[in-house]
């Protein structure tokens, strides 16, 4: 498995597809994703030879160059692939239902993976709070985040509503 960052966010995307397909004989499985952050993510397979000379396919992930986008797409695409390759089940981040601690504005065109802190509420249920500004370049939004909220396309989602959260770290008690 190969993962690179930054190729998709500069002038190089024009070169990525022809290089993988024509020069390396690979296949691009997706080149843009309708999600936020991480839209310019690419996944491809490239034929190579294993150590014993047998033909195998190498997985290639091209992740966005913005730090928050790179970390989110690493967790959503690369980690599950590594888990699968190593036989770890279930693959990927664990998903749990959480209640929103406050209203969140939604993207009207793309699903969003919103950086958040999940903790145990007074009633014993899991509650999520945003880490703040969610721009792709906002590394600070990752500092305290222990989860990614899976938010639908829409206008807004209200305080107390339930969403799924992908856990990236430990949950703190009250």
Model segments located where?
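Flexible glycine/proline-rich
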Residues: 19-174
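Glycine/threonine-rich flexible loop motifs
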Residues: 11-18
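Single conserved hydrophobic/aromatic residue that forms the stacking wall/gate
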Residues: 1-10
């Amino acid at each position: 498995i190969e993962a690179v960052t930054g190729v998709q966010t500069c002038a190089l995307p024009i070169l990525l597809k022809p290089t993988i397909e024509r020069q390396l004989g690979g296949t691009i499985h997706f080149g843009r994703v309708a999600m936020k952050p991480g839209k310019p993510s690419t996944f491809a397979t490239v034929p190579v030879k294993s150590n014993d000379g047998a033909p195998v396919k190498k997985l290639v992930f091209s992740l966005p160059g913005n730090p928050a986008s790179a970390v989110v797409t690493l967790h959503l695409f690369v980690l599950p692939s590594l888990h699968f390759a190593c036989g770890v089940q279930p693959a990927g981040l664990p998903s749990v239902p959480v209640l929103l601690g406050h209203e969140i504005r939604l993207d009207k065109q793309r699903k969003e993976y919103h950086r958040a802190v999940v903790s145990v509420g007074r009633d014993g249920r899991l509650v999520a709070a945003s880490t703040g500004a969610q721009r792709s370049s906002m590394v600070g939004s990752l500092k305290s985040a222990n989860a990614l909220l899976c938010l639908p396309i829409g206008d807004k989602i209200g305080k107390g509503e339930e969403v799924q959260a992908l856990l990236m770290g430990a949950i703190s008690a009250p």
